[in-house]
Amino acid sequence: MNKYSDISESARDVLMEIGNIGTGNAVTALSSMINHRIEIERPNVKIMKFEEVPAMLGGPEEIKLGVLLELSGDLNGMFMFLISTKFAQTMLDKLLGTEVEDVRNLDDMSLSAVCEIGNIMCCSYINAMTAMMDLRVHVSVSDICIDMTGAILSVPMIHFARLSDELLLIEDKYHFDDQEVVSHILFLPEIHSLERIFKALGEEYEG
């Protein structure tokens, strides 16, 4: 077994619980950051094939903002936080009082704010995962990319598709005021890290 889709229901439940804990921690931090109450639905944790991801995110030509963090230590790989233009516009309005017409022309302060939001979200899941699996990791400085979904995904997909044709995707839906916004987190582990995850979940790994 060397695919997410091969794991047992009990291991899937652990992944779901990691998603729940990460989401709870993230929404608490975001609410404090923007000083505004945020409601969040139960996260949707999915195991998906690479080729299915662009359609899941609205199509390859949909403009997204991506925040990338690399992991090293007990786990090596990449976390990617993807948000829509609507999500970015809403959060920047709440956080900075900035009305953004085109997310491709954000100033440095707005870019920094989006990076910080991505850091909060990804690190909430990373902390939940490493605590539950008793692992130690180092998280890189985040990087941000604003482009079409297909372009943002192309580099990590080329690299990680050699290792596995599946990834872990976490979808979160947020509600504040009368708005609903959605974000996605992708986790792409290196092959030896996938082996460690399987072992931590009590699953047998076959390379």
Describe the residue ranges of each PLM region.
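Composition-driven recognition of glycine/serine/threonine/acidic- and proline-rich low-complexity segments
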Residues: N2-V27, S31-G207
